[in-house]
Amino acid sequence: MSSNNGDVRLWGGRFADGPADALARLSASVHFDWRLAPYDIAGSRAHARVLNRAGLLTEDELTRMLAGLDRWPPMWRTLLHRTIADEDVHTALERGLLERLGAELGGKLRAGRSRNDQVATLFRMYLRTTPGSSGLIAELQDALVGLAEAHPEVAMPGRTHLQHAQPVLFAHHVLAHVQALSRDAERLRQWDARTAVSPYGSGALAGSSLGLDPEAVAADLGFEGGSAGNSIDGTASRDFVAEFAFITAMAGINLSRLAEEIIIWNTKEFSFVTLHDAFSTGSSIMPQKKNPDIAELARGKSGRLIGNLTGLLATLKALPLAYNRDLQEDKEPVFDSCDQLEVLLPAFTGMVATLTVHRERMEELAPAGFSLATDIAEWLVRQGVPFRVAHDVAGACVKECESAGIELHQLTDEQFAAISEHLTPEVRSVLTVRGALASRDGRGGTAPSAVAVQLAEVKADLAVQHAWAARES
């Protein structure tokens, strides 16, 4: 029934037997929490130092302990995979330390810390430093900014409900996606500030009676916010994990929205863009196919990221304070989200950076679908016509065009006059795409002058983002 192959367990004494093989298999997490190993080593070094300051390790013991810990980094992967009998990464690493230092010295490292505060701390450390999501997002934004800068005057049909709405600059549209990604990066920075609090010293839930200094550990491990102010919350809270999962899911959603547009733009019917051969795939049976697989995988992976978030929230929703073993299930979804973004973002960036934009096709469709109707209404308002009347008059112009099978700029002066006495020949000044674009020069608008301001602001924000990402790495 039971299994005990000489492996180290961090609990025992009151147990006469066990654990059963079935329980050991269920409990094992070393196959995924191995990625916390470098942070476990760093945490153990910091813990050894506070044990020394508290008089629980002599100077000689501290020196030997740190020397033993120094030997871990080159061999921790081999150590972790030597046996699956270890319950988790922390057990595996402690086993290795005991083997090298002996039970008398190696066994002292466990004093004053529980896996509860240990895991909560290491998980924060991992998420704060890997996989460099902010830097990868910034690289995608750089590619989008480059796309906008390469096509500053290209007009395209702006859409609502996927129907022609008003002409906009292609650069304006692209920068809208950059803005959304900037908020994702900003969320990461804000999340990091909230997560920069160390649970070390919280123990299992009630804190420590050994005179250890949690503030020293927090400083040693780079937690700018110091140590947790409540030991129960320090060990039991996983809102930082849920928030990180939301940020990754939101980033995935923002990628998916852009991906959907690229897929549509790449169709024969739209022909707005062409994908580079290096960032598209073919068909096993149809030789003419050139498929937008990266964009499609971005859509698919966004669902996966959302699933990781919702699964995590379902795990957390009914946990009483403090720690519960359910929290072992908090890591795999977020590890997966990190991995998915790490592989998706570089490919997506390459796809964007190598897009060929077809200006002629975009500008051909920019005025189509009566997209200048709003300009007629606003021109009338500037002539003193109440907007509701102006709206009706512009709608009547569209109706006339639909009946005649023409576009708004093709209406004659006589037809305009027949629709409304307010429609003088001067209305033609707004019936050009360039005129419509130039008129929307308020902050955030699509006029070239307004888009230039947006571009400058985005680039300034990107400089901040790159600096923060460099600190992150």
Swiss-Prot record:
Pathway(s) where this gene product acts: Amino-acid biosynthesis; L-arginine biosynthesis; L-arginine from L-ornithine and carbamoyl phosphate: step 3/3
A molecular function GO annotation: argininosuccinate lyase activity
Superkingdom to which the source organism belongs: Bacteria
Cellular component annotations (GO), alphabetically ordered: cytosol
PROSITE patterns: FUMARATE_LYASES
Keyword Cytoplasm in annotation: yes
Pfam family, one: Lyase_1
Localization in the cell: Cytoplasm
Enzyme class: lyase
Record field: catalytic activity: 2-(N(omega)-L-arginino)succinate = fumarate + L-arginine
A single BP term in Gene Ontology: arginine biosynthetic process via ornithine
Keyword entries, A-Z: Amino-acid biosynthesis, Arginine biosynthesis, Cytoplasm, Lyase
Enzyme Commission code(s) on record: 4.3.2.1
Family according to the record: Belongs to the lyase 1 family. Argininosuccinate lyase subfamily.
NCBIfam families according to UniProt: argH
Protein name: Argininosuccinate lyase
Gene name per UniProt: argH
